[in-house]
Amino acid sequence: MGVAKVLIEVSPWLRDLPFVQLANNNISRYKMETSDGGASVHTVDDTWSTVNPTWEFREAALAILGDNISTDNFGELASGPENAMAVNIELKTKGVGQKFDQLAIYGQTTSTGFLAQTKNFKGLLRMIAEAESSTTTDLDGWLYTGDDSSANNKQVLMAASGASATLVLAMIDALVDSVRDKATHIVMSRLMRRKTNALARAAGNNLVHDKDQLGFPVTRYGEQVLFIDDQIRNNMDDSTLLVTAIASYDYEQAINASAKDTSPIFAVRMAEDGLTGMNGDGMIQVVELGELEGKDAKGKRIKFYCGERLTNKRAAAVLMNATFS
């Protein structure tokens, strides 16, 4: 099986996310739209003023995902009809896809553990925090039942203030409404998708199951594609009032029903002028390393130059403090 096909089978992000190939050396800086500037109304012979859309610069460097792999020459001979190198390539490609799914959410989000490494690309939690300002590292939002007019970050919704609350469909509806122009996807953990299924059935409005243009099964909630990211954990810390300190989040921490049992849910608009992936020099690549020095083995390098950027601050939103029960 080709590496590209393996990637889109294992990663819903890489199946649906549009990618922009970066062809110059300014690979880390991009413009994020903060306002379209609106439009003025004029009369005949009126004085016209200049009102431009507004932008802010953000940083989103590419990461290099991958590893070298090797296949022992004797092992290849003894493996019979199975192509040992092909199996290695397929498994490593799956690992690359799973790592992308993890970083797509958590990359450079926390100062705890391996996700703190600056060689990771920025994930959604970090980019949504930076919708407030380029230096913001927490999620300072508003209660989903209220109004976002006074919120520091309109793209952060809270299921409850300073505590967790069981997911209800009204939370998802408010989340989807926070994305402009219109959300294309809802992203959640497997556990929260199960909860959403149960809520939809109870409301007499089952989720719609369909196939996409590539023939892969898709689930829809209203107009949005709903997909599972298996790298999303259900152990997020509860907020302090309406602020979640994502910089201190520990991805590996145990679930604690009193304070660490929530799961972020995202609504995004995937588009080149919304949430988009970045790649350099093509997509995933397999590089021949030949015979390895000091070993009776052949080697290959699997690599993917990739990243993610949010080119409009209203193209992604997150619901925090929601639990399964």
Model-inferred region functions:
Residues 1-241, 245-325:
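Flexible, glycine/threonine- and acidic-rich loop/arm segments that mediate assembly and lattice contacts
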